[in-house]
Amino acid sequence: FIYPFVKTREWYLLTQFTRQGIMDEHIYVGNKYPSVKLNTTYCFGIDDYEFVVAFETDSPDDFLDLVQELRETEGSRYVKEDTPIFSCVAMSIEDTVKSLGC
């Protein structure tokens, strides 16, 4: 799942200490779903989004539960935009080319 998002201006007005506390809650929730691997890419200045997060899992139900629980955390107050979410299938470059009929 590919999940681009943008933080609010209010997020950046918080102290580093406060932001770290909010992120600690985020990390705690994420650790409850060990089947979901998280990869964060910062893209500020490259695209319309500030971050793109890639979640890797063979359990879509776990991903959906994780996202729902994260939306109930303090950190969600500071998310300005978090859509669209893209569902993807991991495959080799060779298999990707074959799937395109090339």
Residue ranges of predicted features:
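Short, low-complexity, polar/charged sequence segments that are solvent-exposed and flexible
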Residues: 20-24, 57-60, 72-75
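Alpha-helix capping and helix-coil boundary motifs
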Residues: 15, 59, 91-93
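A generic secondary-structure signal
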Residues: 28-29, 69, 73
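Short S/T/G/P-rich N-terminal loop/turn motif that feeds into the first structured element of a domain
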Residues: 1-32, 44, 65, 95-102
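Glycine-rich beta-strand-turn "strand-cap" elements at beta-sheet edges
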Residues: 33-48, 74-102
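Short, well-ordered beta-strand segments in beta-rich or mixed alpha/beta enzyme
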Residues: 1-6, 45-70
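Mixed-charge, polar/low-complexity N-terminal
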Residues: 25-27, 35-38, 59-60
